[in-house]
Every structure is written in structure tokens, then in C-alpha cells.
């Protein structure tokens, strides 16, 4: 993102922590996903083989030797500066193993201390067998953009940073970027506003700029090909805020490009995400374009930013994701219930605690340090809640019966439009008795862009619909 940011914290009156030990009415929940193993659940934290949050933003996927490799920005909750690029691997796109930080912060230069590193993309060069990584580098004010590149002999690194990516002898001084590899092995660099560069045979430089400024105002570029038609996706420029992304089509990478419009219903803000990549998902003899989007959460990107991955419908130049699926089966490309063997812990019969207000069947609070401690039995717990324009961050923790914290993270309840959905399914623990703790932090996702325009929430509200105790799930 070509933007600078300012975090604002909203404070409200301090109240003491509240311990809620109450009897919840149990309601059975159907579980369509019980026998499925390859489930993607959007808009919630994903956990890797170490039980840590999958931290790979602005990402891409490379399929190599029968395995999927996810590369992304390894984000921090404390700073927007470059920390490193991460790599995860999977054999099913659902369960991820942390490989390593494949490109760490450098001692100096474009990716040195107090620099920006974003939009990491990786391609395997057909002519050399080398893996080449591309990224946007910048200063923290986003006033020194430059495309950089790194190389590795193995897909999971470590990658060696090679410096600025050039056309001729000139560095390409741009910011938001993507890549596309055609079926003939030709590689392309995609740039904000719609520039397209064809890469050299070894992928180490740009050979020619094929298209210039065909999408003014567009960023987060991504491209794919389906049945001989090229699709070029962009978002609008609204800082970390979500917007309605759009696409163009062409019979060749060099154009002519024709605007196709939105690919998600207007006003849905691309299901609260921003395009980062389109992965060609093989299904038998067919290839399905899988949209990959970021649900940013500034300033707490490491903890609270999540992902939206969805199969796209591309037919004769028409592109769409007609409806949002929070959870879907990769094998069948169908929507499923994300929760297995769940019991809803109804909030309706709970007594109203200080700091929490009942609104119908919801419990809400915007008072900093307001706490709910909810006993549950099972292996996991899920929170279903409403994100809206007043939402803030909740600190969600799982404690054992002795009060030891087993897991803790921030969850974002902000959205420009009201949306009730699963906000988190906690990591899985041994079956037993636990406490789910939900605490209002008093912090809002708020930021400004270079023009000092303000974005984000106007409060720090946490709105709970249901708590679900889970005995078994594939998430």
C-alpha cells in the first residue's frame, strides 16, 4: 500500500474485570463439515503446525513437486516496517506447516531496518530452475518505492536479496505489484495503475513494458488466464480499508484491455478483502481460479488480519464470486458448515453484567477492560459476532481450569457494513474443561493516509452473537 498511517486509540472508562460463571442453555448445531478434510474458513485466524497464527499477508501460492507453498508478509503488531517474508507449505491448502522466514530483514539497503517490504510474489524460472522472489520495497513514509528481487535454489529458501529489479539499467521505482506466469513459461511483472512488464528469460530483469497506465487509480494487481482470456484484477485506493475490486479482460497480455466491472456484488467491498493473488486450483481436468484476498486489520496485522480465499466463476470474459462462503470444501467447491460437533452456548439466558449491554440476543460492550469469562467443555471454542462500523478489538484467550493462559490473541470486530460471522475458532486442545475469556481492549482499528484522511472505526465496540463449544473440527 502506498500510504502512511496513524494509529488512534479510543479510551473509555476503566471497570474491573468481571467473572461470569453462569449456566448457558445448550442448543445442538448441525455440522455439514464433519467428514470433510479440506476446508477453507475465511475471515478467521488460521493456525499452523506449531499452533501459531499463519502470518503471510499480501501473499501468493506456488505449487511445486505436489506441494503448495504460501509466501507472504510476516507482519508485526508493533510496527509497519519490514520484518521478513514467511513461507508455509501444505498438501491440501488447509493445513499449513511453517517452513521459515525465507527472506529476513537485511542489515542495510532496500530491506534494511525501518524499511517497508510488501506484496511478495515467487515464480520458478523455467529456463534456470531458480526460484525468483519479487517485492515492493520503500521507506516508512512510502516516498522511496522500488521493486526488488531475491533468488533461491530451493523453493523454501533462504532467498538471497539481489537488489533493485530493473528494466535496462533503471530500477523500476513503483510500489503495489504482482506477478503472472503464463502457460508458456513467460513471466510478467504487474504494477499498480496497470503497467505490465515482460520478464527476461532468467526472470532477473524486465525485458519490455507491454502496457502502461491502463488502470489509473488501481492497486494490488493480480492476473490469471482461463480458456484463452486474460483477467486483470485491481482494488481501488482506500488505504487499509476495503473496497469494491474490479477487473479487465484481454485476448493477450499486451491487450487490448477492456474493463469488465466488479466481480463481487456492489457494496460488499470484495467480501471485506483486497485482491492479492489468483491461484490456479486444479480440479481434475479443469483449473479453477481461486481468489486470494487480504482482510487487513491495521494496526494489529499479525494478530487480527485474516484471509478470504474463494473459487471464482470465469466464463467467456465474465468474472464473479456471486456469494460469500465463510467456509467451503476444496474438493467439492461447495459451501459447508465450519463447525463440527458444536453446541451453542446461548447468550440469551445470561445475566447482564456491568459493562455489557444486552441488545436482543446479543451482548455488547465498548468499555475498556470489560471481561466475560465463559466456561466451556470440548477441544475448541468459536465466537460468532457482529463486525460493524463501531467495532474495535477484543482480546480473546483460552484458560485452563487453573487459570493458566493457553492461547491469547486480538480479534477485529470492525467492518464498514454490519456482518455477523465466525470471528475465531480457537486452536485445538485436549478434550476437557476450559474458560473462554473475551476482553474489550478499548482500541479501534483507525488510521490515516498520506492526505491525513481518516479511516476505520468510530468506537471500540465488541458485539457477541453466540459462543460455540466444539468437540471436533477440521479447521
Which residue ranges define each predicted feature?
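Glycan-recognition surfaces in beta-rich domains, encompassing non-catalytic CBMs
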Residues: 331-472
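Polar/charged alpha-helical tracts
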Residues: 5, 50, 401-402
Amino acid at each position: 500500500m502506498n500510504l502512511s498511517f496513524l494509529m488512534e486509540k479510543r479510551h473509555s472508562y476503566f471497570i474491573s474485570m468481571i467473572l461470569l460463571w453462569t449456566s448457558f442453555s445448550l442448543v445442538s448445531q448441525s455440522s455439514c463439515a464433519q467428514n470433510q478434510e479440506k476446508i477453507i474458513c475465511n475471515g478467521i485466524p488460521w493456525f499452523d503446525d506449531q499452533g501459531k497464527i499463519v502470518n503471510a499477508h499480501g501473499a501468493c501460492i506456488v505449487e511445486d513437486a505436489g506441494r503448495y507453498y504460501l509466501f507472504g508478509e510476516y507482519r508485526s503488531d508493533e510496527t509497519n516496517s519490514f520484518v521478513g517474508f514467511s513461507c508455509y507449505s501444505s498438501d491440501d491448502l488447509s493445513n499449513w506447516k511453517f517452513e521459515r522466514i525465507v527472506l529476513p530483514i537485511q542489515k542495510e539497503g532496500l530491506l534494511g531496518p525501518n524499511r517497508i517490504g510488501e506484496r511478495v510474489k515467487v515464480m520458478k524460472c523455467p529456463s534456470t530452475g531458480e526460484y525468483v522472489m519479487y517485492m515492493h520495497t520503500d521507506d516508512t513514509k512510502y516516498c522511496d518505492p522500488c521493486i526488488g528481487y531475491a533468488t533461491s535454489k530451493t523453493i523454501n529458501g533462504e532467498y538471497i536479496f539481489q537488489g533493485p529489479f530493473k528494466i535496462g539499467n533503471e530500477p523500476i521505482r513503483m510500489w503495489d505489484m504482482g506477478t503472472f506466469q503464463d502457460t508458456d513459461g513467460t513471466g510478467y511483472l504487474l504494477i499498480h495503475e496497470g503497467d505490465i512488464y515482460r520478464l527476461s528469460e532468467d526472470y532477473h530483469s524486465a525485458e519490455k513494458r507491454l502496457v502502461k497506465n491502463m488502470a489509473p487509480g488501481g492497486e494490488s494487481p493480480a492476473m490469471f488466464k482461463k480458456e484463452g482470456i486474460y483477467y486483470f484484477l485491481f482494488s481501488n485506493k482506500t488505504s487499509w480499508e476495503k473496497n469494491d475490486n474490479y477487473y479487465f479482460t484481454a485476448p493477450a497480455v499486451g491487450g487490448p484491455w477492456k474493463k469488465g466491472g466488479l466481480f463481487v456484488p456492489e457494496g460488499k467491498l470484495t467480501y471485506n478483502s483486497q485482491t492479492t493473488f489468483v491461484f490456479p486450483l486444479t480440479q481434475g481436468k479443469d483449473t479453477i481460479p481461486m481468489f486470494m484476498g487480504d482482510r487487513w486489520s491495521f494496526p494489529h496485522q499479525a494478530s487480527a488480519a485474516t484471509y478470504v480465499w474463494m473459487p471464482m466463476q470465469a466464463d467467456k470474459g465474465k468474472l464473479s464470486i456471486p456469494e460469500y462462503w465463510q467456509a467451503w470444501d476444496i474438493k467439492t467447491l461447495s459451501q459447508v458448515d465450519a463447525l463440527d460437533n458444536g453446541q451453542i452456548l446461548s447468550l440469551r439466558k445470561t445475566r447482564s453484567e456491568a459493562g455489557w449491554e444486552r441488545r436482543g440476543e446479543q451482548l455488547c460492550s465498548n468499555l475498556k477492560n470489560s471481561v466475560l469469562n465463559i466456561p466451556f467443555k470440548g477441544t475448541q471454542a468459536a465466537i460468532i459476532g457482529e463486525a460493524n462500523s463501531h467495532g474495535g478489538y477484543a482480546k480473546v484467550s483460552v484458560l485452563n481450569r487453573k487459570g493458566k493462559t493457553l492461547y491469547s490473541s486480538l480479534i477485529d470486530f470492525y467492518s464498514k457494513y454490519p456482518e455477523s460471522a465466525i470471528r475465531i475458532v480457537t486452536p485445538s486442545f485436549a478434550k476437557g474443561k476450559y474458560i473462554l475469556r473475551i476482553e474489550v481492549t478499548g482500541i479501534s482499528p483507525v488510521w490515516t493516509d498520506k492526505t491525513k484522511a481518516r479511516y476505520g472505526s468510530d468506537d471500540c465496540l465488541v458485539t457477541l452473537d453466540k459462543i460455540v463449544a466444539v468437540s471436533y473440527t477440521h479447521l
